[in-house]
C-alpha cells in the first residue's frame, strides 16, 4: 500500500520558489477527481506547496542513505525537483511504486478501492479517525446546504483536503454495489448509502429554518456529496432544485441587508454577484470546481463557522483565488511595489550570476554612477561594442526598463567583455573576482582611448589668437575615469636595508586588494576583515641585495599613498591542493565589521580620496588659466596631460592624419541637393571676405601680409578656412552635443530606444539638420579636399561640384560594401546565437546538477585557512579595544563603511551561486540581489549570514558616505517617508 505521508528533511527546486534550504517536513499524496497531487508540508508551519503529479512526473529516484534509510528524489516535467531525505526504506519503496504507477498512467487502478488491493483511496479512508469523522459530521449538520459553492475559499490552506476527498471517491464507487453502511455517524463514510444522505437533506432543511448562517461561506462539504456526478436522485429532482434556489436567494437578500448596515456592502455585493453567476445547473465541469473549492477549506474555518459575521476577508481572497489558479507557488509582485520599478534584479543568462552580483555592487556606488553618466561623455564617439558604452547604457536603463529589455542589455555587456576575454564568452560558471578585475581594467582602457581620441580632435590656436582661452579649454578636455576616481588607489612599497638603512621606494596602483584569511585560533574569537587587512600591510623581512652595502636582507613596508573613495577587498577563500589537483573552498568564519580603519597603514603624506565635485577637466583647466600652457602635471586620469603648444606644420599634418577618417565620416551627414551646396558655397565666400578683413587687421602675426602675398589662391583658401574652423570649433562642439545628450546620462533619445544592433549603428550616423552643418563642417570638407593632392581641382564652383560627384560614387561603393558586410554579419550572428542557445541549455543543466550536489556539502569548512606560514596579527589590549569600538562607530581617521558584499554559496569555484547584498543610499536600506529576485534585508542579517560565504567586500570612505547620505536626506526629505510606506511589502 502506498503510504499517505512520509516524513524527513525536505528540499524543493522550482521556477517559482528557486532552491530552498533543507527543512523538516513531509510529502503527502492527495487524490481527487482522478487527479493525483503531492502536498509538501513543513513542520514549522506555513502554506503547504502543492504539485500536480498526473501526467507531470518525469522520473522517480531512490538513493540509499544509511541503514534502512534512503533519499527519495522526484523530478517533474515542469522543471520542479523535490527531495525528501532520511525516509524509512519500506515507506520510500511503497511511495515510489505508487509514483511509478502514476507516471505510467495507471492512476485509475491505483486510486480505485477494492478488497485486497493496495488502493490509495482505501488508505486515505482508513486513516480518517473516529474523532475527525464525528467533528466533520457535526459541522455538516450545522451548516445550510447552498445551491452552489463559490470559489471564495480556493485560496485557503488545504489542511483538511484528505478528509473529504477519499470519502467522495468511495461513495461514488460503492453506491453502485450497494455496500451496507457500517458507520452511520460519519457523513463522508466510504460505505454511506444514498437513502441515508437523503435523510440528512431533510434534517438539514429543518435546521436551516431555525438557524440561517451565511451559506456561501459556511457550507462546502455538503454540495460535494450531492454532486451530479454521483447517483443521488434527490438532487436530480427539478422541483427540489427550484425550492432550494428560492430559499438561497431569500437568504442572500437578507444577509445583504444585514451587511449593508455594517458597512461591508461593496465586498458583500461582490460576493453575492459572484455566487449568482455560478447558479446554473450542476454539470461535470461545475462539480469539478466545487470539489476543488471545497478541498481547500481549512480546519480553522470548519471549527469557527459561527463567528464568521463579516465575509470581507473571504471576499478579498476570492479575488486573489483567480490569480492563484496555477498554484500557490507562483510569484506575484504586490500592487504596492509596481511603482518602485528600481527594485528589480538582472536575469540569469545561463550561469551569469557572477556577472549580476558584480554589476549590482558596482552600480550601487553612487559616485561611480555619477562619474559615468553625468559628466557629458560623448557616447556617439565611442564604438558600439565598447564596454563603457554598454556599461553606461545598462546603468541608465536598469531602474526604468522591463526585465526583457535589461536582459538584452546584459547580453551586450557580456558580449563586450567576451570580445576581450574569451573565457567569459560561454555559459560556464566563472569567478566573480576575475570578472570584476576584467571589467575594471577594460573600463579604464576604454576611457583612455576616449581621452586620446578627444585630445586629437580640436585644433589649438597660437598664443596671440583671439578666443585662445576657450580653445585651450576645449583642447584640454579630459573625461574622468570612474574607475580611477572611485576605486583606484596607490600603495608605496619601501624596501629598507637592514645593514645600512638604504631605502628604495616603489609605487603601485591597485583597483582592489586580495587579502588572506587570518589564521583561526580555537581558543580565541573569530578573526575579522580588519585582521586580514592588517595582515596584508604588515612589515615582512625578505632576501635583498643592497647596491650600497651589499647587504643580503631587508624589510618591506607597505603604506597607502593615495586613498580611494571605495575600497574593494577580495577575501581568498579558495585553496588549491596540488597533490589532489582540487580547488577547495574554505568556509572559515570571518567577522564582517561595519567600519574598517586604514589609520595604521597611512602616513602624513597620504592623499585623501578625491572629493565628489572633482573632475579631471577642472583639474587641468585651472592651471591653464594661470600659465596658459601645460608643461607637466600629475592628475588622476587614465591619460597623460595634453601639451599646451603645437608646432604649426607638424601639428597640422598630425591632426589631419589622425582625423582623416573621421572627417570622411562627417561628410556622410550632408545632404546632396543643390540648394545645400550653393548655400554652403555662399557661406564659404562670406568667410573668405571676413578672413581677409581679419588679415588686414593683423590678428594673426604668423599669417601676416607677407605670408599672404606669397601664397597662391589655393594655399590662401586653405589658410583662411583653417582660421574660420578655429573660431567655430568651440561652438560646433556645443551644438553637436546639445541635441543628442541628456543632462543626466548623456544618452539621447535614440540611445534610449531599444533597437537591434544594425539599426543602432544606422541611428548613430543619421543626418543632422542643415542648420547644424554650418560653415565649420563645410570647412572640414574643403580641408580634406586640400589635403588630398590627387583631388585638387582649379578654383571655381564647378570643380567643387565635380569633387562632390566623385565623392558620391565613393560613398555609394561604401554603402554597398556596408550592406554586404551587414548581411554577412547577420548570418554569422544567427549561427552564433543558435550555438549560444545550445551551449546555454547544456550549461544550465550541468550547473543545476553541480549546484544540487554542492548544496549537500555547502555547510562550509570551519578548519584553518591553511596559511600555516603566515604570521597572525597581534594587538595590544588597548589596540584591540579601540578597533572593536571603531568597527561600530567609525570614529578613527581614514575609516571606511561597509556598502556591499558579493557572496558565493557553494563548495567549489566551478559550481555554486553568487548573490550580492547592497546598501542603497537613496533608500537608506539593505537589499539582497539574487539574480532577478530582490528582497529587503537588515545590515545585522547580512553581517551574520555572510560570515562564511562573503567573498568580495566593498567599503566606502566614511566622509564620502556621510556626504552622499546627507545630500540624499536634504534632497528628498518627504519622498523618502512616502517611499518607505510604499515599499514596506518588500
Curated annotation (Swiss-Prot):
Residues 171-195 have a biased composition (Polar residues). Residues 269-298, 818-828 have a biased composition (Low complexity). SUPFAM superfamilies: Cysteine proteinases (SSF54001). A motif (D-box 3) lies at residues 160-168. A motif (D-box 1) lies at residues 71-79. Residues 134-238, 251-305, 683-710, 729-751, 811-840 are annotated as: Disordered. It catalyses: Thiol-dependent hydrolysis of ester, thioester, amide, peptide and isopeptide bonds formed by the C-terminal Gly of ubiquitin (a 76-residue protein attached to proteins as an intracellular targeting signal). Its EC number is 3.4.19.12. GO terms for biological process: cell division; G1/S transition of mitotic cell cycle; protein K11-linked deubiquitination; protein K48-linked deubiquitination; proteolysis; regulation of protein stability. Residues 344-958 form the USP domain. GO terms for molecular function: cysteine-type deubiquitinase activity; cysteine-type endopeptidase activity. Residues 149-159, 251-260, 729-739, 829-840 have a biased composition (Basic and acidic residues). It holds the Pfam family UIM. A motif (KEN box 2) lies at residues 224-226. A motif (KEN box 1) lies at residues 32-34. A motif (KEN box 3) lies at residues 789-791. Belongs to the peptidase C19 family. It comes from the Eukaryota. It comes from Gallus gallus (Chicken). The gene is USP37. It is an enzyme of class 3 (hydrolase). GO terms for cellular component: cytosol; nucleus. Residues 712-731, 813-832, 835-854 form the UIM domain. This is Ubiquitin carboxyl-terminal hydrolase 37. The active site is at 353 (nucleophile), 913 (proton acceptor). Keywords: Cell cycle, Cell division, Hydrolase, Mitosis, Protease, Repeat, Thiol protease, Ubl conjugation pathway.
